[in-house]
Amino acid sequence: MSYYPDLTPCDYFGFDHQGHLLAVGWLDGTQEYSSGSVTEEDYRHLSMLIETAFQPFHSMGAHQCNLCQFDGVSGNKNIFIPDKGDILVAPELILHYINQHHYLHPKRFITAMRRIESTTTMDYKKQLLANHGQFLLKGNQS
């Protein structure tokens, strides 16, 4: 998995998002990251959102944690969170990073995540569009 500092443009998916796709939680064992506590309520909500996450792109396989010897099946989804004219994108491994490595994501991410009830609703898709997420919906077309 590629490393991106939090809230920097993420070009992992290989399309032009004009700087509106910002990375959160794309960690690497060679880079420092913020640590702290996440509430159980926020962790459960993020877990639920990732469980049912809208996936506009096909995964090329699972990514493993390079911070530890984690060997579980994980890392093949991403969560897209619309916020203030941008889309914040976090890998599924963010749950592992929070739980096992005490990763603390930016406040902007948790605030935006709390506003999302589900990624399976039309309201969510409208929020993506309202925050420059057209590239996500175009990527989902066959």
Regions found by a protein language model. Give the residues of each.
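Alpha-helical interaction/linker modules in multidomain eukaryotic proteins
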Residues: 1-142
